[in-house]
From Swiss-Prot:
Compartment(s) of residence: Nucleus
Organism: Mus musculus
Region (Transactivation domain): 192-326
Domains: entry comment: The OAR motif may negatively regulate DNA-binding and therefore transcriptional activity. It is found in the C-terminal transactivation domain that stimulates transcription.
Region forming the signal peptide: none
Protein's name in the database: ALX homeobox protein 1
Family according to the record: Belongs to the paired homeobox family.
Length: 326
């Protein structure tokens, strides 16, 4: 009893053979004593019920309480009635289970979560079905041939040409238009790639720079060096002198040497008329070693030797003409 009065301060109507009745502001034993051996239905018991719930200042409230008091209404139940043969804790647990069931039960009229998910899936399916699907068209060889013929004539056919082509190829005008768009993109890509390759080939042909030097120049360089060492002993080429380094930077600047040799040759034609050709070649090599660049390439040497031979023949003819005139 003490446990119930302290922990569970509940209200219940006074009923016969009821062991549990608790009111506000009083202990359970006091309430039970005031309700013993009394009939709980009538005006006489109204005062005791009011005393259990609290005193009222005026008498007319007793009449009103007689009509609306929970003591007179047996249908209202604010507490837990003990059933014979069952302990109290089972009743309390049952009441708590009922409250939990009421809280967890869904509200009527509201769709459940599974139904909402189904509605969402249906909406997604409707949206996806409303989207335009893309289908890949497989063209036959005859269709491609007809399309390529028109593409060779014009890259941008008008609507009339596309409709006529669609009738011949048994395609729709939209398919023909899409094919021409893709074909133009492919053609532009090929043209761009061809221009890049052409530019690369032109650059390679214009600026063809070989990394390794030519091998045919090595024997001529060695021969010129040996000839210079054998003739003078202390002859130093112009490339080794610091004051004449400009001649090393221009390997083909032989104009002063050639002009002086040609001038000396024309002035002294009679003097060189009896000199053998081999001695003249040796002198020209020595002159080139002292005045200009000693490293001669093979084509330059051949050109000079042929021009010297022609001048030698002209000198002989001139000498013969002079002697014949005398």
């Amino acid at each position: 009893m003490e446990f119930l009065s302290e922990k569970f301060a509940l209200k219940s109507p006074p009923s016969k053979n009821s062991d549990f009745y608790m009111g506000t502001g009083g202990a359970l034993e006091h309430v039970m004593e005031t309700l013993d051996n009394e009939s709980f239905y009538g005006k006489a018991t109204a005062g005791k019920c009011v005393q259990a719930f609290g005193p009222l200042p005026r008498a007319e409230h007793h009449v009103r309480l007689d009509r609306t008091s929970p003591c007179q209404d047996s249908s209202v139940n604010y507490g837990i009635t003990k059933v014979e043969g069952q302990p109290l804790h089972t009743e309390l647990n049952r009441a708590m289970d009922n409250c939990n069931n009421l809280r967890m039960s869904p509200v009527k009229g509201m769709p459940e979560k599974s139904e909402l998910d189904e509605l969402g899936d249906k909406c997604d399916s409707n949206v996806s079905s409303s989207k335009k699907r893309r289908h890949r068209t497989t063209f036959t060889s005859l269709q491609l041939e007809e399309l390529e013929k028109v593409f060779q004539k014009t890259h941008y056919p008008d609507v009339y040409v596309r409709e006529q082509l669609a009738l011949r190829t048994e395609l729709t005008e939209a398919r023909v238009q899409v094919w021409f768009q893709n074909r133009r993109a492919k053609w532009r890509k090929r043209e761009r790639y061809g221009q890049i390759q052409q530019a690369k080939s032109h650059f390679a042909a214009t600026y063809d720079i070989s990394v390794l030097p030519r091998t045919d120049s090595y024997p001529q360089i060695q021969n010129n060096l040996w000839a210079g060492n054998a003739s003078g002993g202390s002859v130093v080429t112009s490339c080794m002198l610091p004051r004449d380094a400009s001649s090393c930077m221009t390997p083909y600047s032989h104009s002063p040497r050639t002009d002086s040799s040609y001038t000396g040759f024309s002035n002294h034609q009679n003097q060189f008329s009896h000199v053998p050709l081999n001695n003249f070649f040796t002198d020209s090599l020595l002159t080139g070693a002292t005045n200009g660049h000693a490293f001669e390439t093979k084509p330059e040497f051949e050109r000079r030797s042929s021009s010297i031979a022609v001048l030698r023949m002209k000198a002989k003819e001139h000498t013969a003409n002079i002697s014949w005139a005398m």
